[in-house]
Amino acid sequence: MSRHKSKSIPGRNLRLADQIQKDLAGIIQREIDMTRAGLITLSGVELSADYAHAKVYFTVLGAEPDTAAALLNEKAGWLHSQLYKLLHIHTVPTLRFVHDPQITRGIEMSMLIDRANRPGPHSGVPDEPEDQS
């Protein structure tokens, strides 16, 4: 009995994930009224090995992440059908939208660093010493 070699194309997973992210961002921007969900940015797509499932990571400004996730997941079936029209692949993955906490945490860390570097009585950085000439 012979073994079948993997027919996986190197880098295909990453290229497909990038294409899905790009296409979804365009569809969401053009076709869906997301006023209740705030400003949504897709930050990444993670595909399963068989391309059947995709976790779509997003960040949101101006709304609660849970609200945005609920609206996006409510539209996931319709978004899947729109992707099917754009992507020329046999299996378009089912979509699940997940808030990306990494971006939010990065913003919080940046704000803490800015606050720590700001001179003043509550910043932790001493004021410039007065010139005693």
Curated annotation (Swiss-Prot):
- GO annotation terms (biological process): maturation of SSU-rRNA
Q: Does the keyword Translocase apply?
A: no
Q: Where is the signal peptide?
A: none
Major localisation? cytoplasm
Swiss-Prot/TrEMBL keywords: Cytoplasm, Ribosome biogenesis
Q: Where in or outside the cell?
A: Cytoplasm
GO cellular component, alphabetical, reads: cytosol
List the protein's name. Answer: Ribosome-binding factor A
Q: Which organism is it from?
A: Bordetella bronchiseptica (strain ATCC BAA-588 / NCTC 13252 / RB50) (Alcaligenes bronchisepticus)
What taxonomic lineage is listed for the species of origin? Bacteria, Pseudomonadati, Pseudomonadota, Betaproteobacteria, Burkholderiales
